């Protein structure tokens, strides 16, 4: 298929829970997909751009979760991180809103920079509850003190984050 995220165990469980009507009818899907750092501009020039190279995986995941194709799509993006990416004709930060035939909404947020690691989350609001697939982190220890709360960072990049999805797909 080439779209491995639907094989991620956490995303697959979220989809199963949705299909099993555990939160009722879906209403609002939010997909967050932030890379830890932008690619080299030389890559950007040949990649097809953020929408075709990066967000395409989120388009597939959204349509897989919603079980249909959208009827309306709107997008906005800008080059906020590196002006050279903009000069190459691409954006590094974007939001897409997709409306489905029955009125469900999907919002996809992409950025080429998240200083804290590879941020990959899904949240879906239903008529009877909320499903969330959170980041896969380096470890699950959370330290809480009077100074604040500290936890591990997300996995660094897609190979580490989606290793189990690649294995499940093949």
What positions do the PLM features span?
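Short, hinge-like loop/turn segments at secondary-structure boundaries
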Residues: 16-20, 45-48, 125, 150
